Amino acid sequence: MAQTMTPSSITDGQKEEEPILRCISEGENLVIPATDGKALISEEKDVFKVWIDPDFLRLDANEPSNPTPEAVPRVYEMERDTTFEHMFDSVCKDKDKICWTQSQIIGFVQKYPNWLHPEGWATFFPFKSKGNFFVAYVFWYGPAWLDVFVG
């Protein structure tokens, strides 16, 4: 199943009878380093060596952020099919609280490639750019084989 990430341990979403997501990083010591906010996915050809979706530029999903402090991410695995809206709402209704910066996404991918879903499934990272909500889909095909799409 696909995985999704949040940059902090926010859990104010409503419970459902059949959970949408299951946290698989509980008890792990994952830490995203502080960032200066300047790194952009569209410019990280050394990280995403297979493909960087040109829609990052076409959709104007290419905005630097403010610097961010160290963050403790949570990694979730999807338990059932759903929409992005329902999936992210199950973690937190306030999407601003679960959004990553592009610098944080890059930092996580570089530091924790083993937490990206193998076997051709995407790992989803919610982020905002210029007031719009996007999802970065990161695919890991093995060491040095990453690509990223935006939707």
Predicted features and spans:
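A binding-site-centric feature that preferentially detects glycan-recognition modules on secreted/surface proteins
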Residues: M1-I98, Q102-G151
